[in-house]
Amino acid sequence: MYNKVIMIGRLTAKPEMVKTPTDKSVTRATVAVNRRFKGSNGEREADFINVVMWGRLAETLASYGTKGSLISVDGELRTRKYEKDGQTHYITEVLASSFQLLESRSQRAMRENNISGDLSDLVLEEEELPF
């Protein structure tokens, strides 16, 4: 049997880390992953996939991940259940074994500041040039 998930998407919110009662770090995040096809309205639909990270992985994502960060996640699919008001509820999520942030700091800063990557209209006066 083989259980492997690999996905690339964007974080929907800033990941928040919490400590368990036994002092283990855990971070939960949601990754928006675009589907390969467009919906009936002509727009690309997305799936919102819950991800769980533990330990150093959780601490690292909480420190460096931001809303909108492009991320690659490797892990395995897990289902857990709990009882509430006599009803059994199931939660399916990815238990991450590794992740990689796929944007440089400058790309992230441009995205966060809504700056386009196209600088063709940029005009500098001669006295503004650093050389």
Swiss-Prot record:
Residue span(s) of domain SSB: 1-103
Important for interaction with partner proteins, short sequence motif: residues: 126-131
GO molecular function, one term: single-stranded DNA binding
Biological processes per GO annotation: DNA recombination; DNA repair; DNA replication
Magnesium keyword on record: no
CDD domains: SSB_OBF (cd04496)
Gene3D superfamilies, per database record: Nucleic acid-binding proteins
Xref: InterPro entries: NA-bd_OB-fold, Primosome_PriB/ssb, ssDNA-bd
Subunit structure: Homotetramer.
Protein name per its UniProtKB record: Single-stranded DNA-binding protein 2
Species, as recorded: Streptococcus agalactiae serotype III (strain NEM316)
